[in-house]
A protein has these predicted regions:
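Catalytic Walker B motif of ABC-type/P-loop ATPase nucleotide-binding domains
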Residues: 150-154
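Helix-to-loop junction immediately C-terminal to a conserved catalytic motif
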Residues: 39
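The feature captures the beta-strand-to-loop junction immediately N-terminal to the Walker
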Residues: 24-26
Length: 195
């Protein structure tokens, strides 16, 4: 915001499918900025970002929505929508203009709900969920998007410690079970060491 401050230079890194990778750093050091850059939400200052062998800038927005899904830190105040409807929005890169879910889309949504372990929440209204339940719903939405890469910005920010550990274990399990690349940021060293 204003002056450009270089916090790192000459970084070369790769993350494989089926891996959960944690970006660890104190609050305010640029973790969220890096995630926004990696997901093309904001322009990069320099260098190259490749996903599946293709420069991120060479993807159209629609193509990128089939490659990267993002779960942000901000709590969404969603009213008048059920859990299954919200998770169904993860299918938007594959649906037509009206967003009508096909039988296959509904199957993907149901599978995502099962993977995250929230079938009992499927017909609840989103605004009635606890923070931990809501975060699981957002992860299920990212899974329903069927991208090879999932970015999560401080996914445990509003959770108590036992829920944080449960969330990290879930993400670790999902990375292996789905063979997705899961990349998350956190400032919590103790939590990062749990994985």
């Amino acid at each position: 915001k204003g002056d450009v401050k270089v916090v790192a230079d000459g970084i070369c890194a790769g993350i494989n499918s089926g891996e959960l990778t944690c970006l660890l750093g104190a609050n305010g050091v640029g973790k969220s900025t890096l995630l926004r850059t990696l997901s093309a939400f904001q322009p990069k200052l320099g260098g190259n970002i490749f996903i599946e062998g293709k420069e991120i800038g060479d993807y159209t927005d629609k193509q990128l929505s089939r490659v990267i899904s993002v779960v942000l830190t901000e709590k969404c105040d969603i009213r008048n929508m059920s859990v299954v409807e919200l998770i169904g929005l993860g299918r938007s890169p594959y649906t037509g203009f009206w967003g009508t879910l096909s039988k296959e889309d509904k199957t993907v949504v149901d599978k995502s709900i099962a993977l995250v372990g929230i079938p009992h929440l499927a017909h609840r209204m989103v605004h009635t969920l606890s923070d931990g339940e809501r975060q699981k719903v957002m992860i299920a939405k990212a899974l329903a998007q069927e991208t090879p890469v999932i970015y999560l910005d401080e996914p445990t920010a509003f959770l108590d410690f036992p829920s944080k550990v449960e969330m990290m274990q879930l993400l670790h399990q999902l990375s292996r079970q789905t063979d997705k690349t899961i990349f998350l940021s956190t400032h919590d060293l103790e939590l990062a060491l749990q994985i």
